[in-house]
Amino acid sequence: MKNARKIKDLLYEQVARIGKVFSSPKRLELIELLCQGEKRVETLASEASISVKLTSSHLRELRMAQLVETERQGKNIYYRLADKSVANLWVQIHMLAEERLVELQLALQKFVTQPDDLIPSDRDSLLKAARKGEVVVLDVRPADEYLNAHLPFARSIPLDELRQRLAELPKDRSIVAYCRGPYCLMAVDAVALLKQEGFTAIHLRDGIAEWEAAVSG
């Protein structure tokens, strides 16, 4: 075929656009945040701890790569993932990184992972126990993220409301807390608080993106 090299280079160049977008730590965090549901630029900037200007720049890159979409609602513009495949790719990338990178494994063990964390193979048993009411699955993300999507049988108590709402939780059953995913610390903080107050609490590293990827996979 004539110009075969030029054609091959063009094809790889286009695929590399996706890799380039995923090469930024902050864009990865924005993708994880958008896995929770659509959000305004200002909300994303606050949750990612960066300026609105820089957030807009990152979102522009994501949009150019067709990974996010926008919708105007009144005066506000909301961003969302283009489809579930973007969330699934994020899950596959961070799972590969956790498998291959010792530095990431050590960081997770030091800052995030707890000795009694539930592991992926526990999903079926967790679902059965939650269905029977033997455990309480607790979503500690903001309420709007819970309303967008949540794990089966989960109840919502955002982390910033947890201390005031402890009376709503039983002490005779284990509480399994989760948040946005394996790099989210809200569930870690929730488990620490619950244990301090005499509850039996366990950290589930999965977020909604990891759970849905496992179910669909």
Label every PLM stretch briefly.
Residues 1-11:
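Long, low-complexity, charged/polar intrinsically disordered regions in eukaryotic proteins
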Residues 13-51, 77-82:
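N-terminal helix-turn-helix DNA-binding core of bacterial DNA-binding proteins
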Residues 67, 169-212:
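Catalytic cysteine-centered active loop of the rhodanese-like fold, especially the PTP/DSP P-loop
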Residues 63-73:
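Beta-hairpin "wing" of winged helix-turn-helix
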Residues 59-60:
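Short, hydrophobic-biased segments on the C-terminal half of alpha helices
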Residues 50, 80-136, 140-148:
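Flexible, polar/low-complexity N-terminal or interdomain linker segments that lie immediately upstream
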Residues 125-189:
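Positively charged, proline/Ser/Thr-rich regional signature most characteristic
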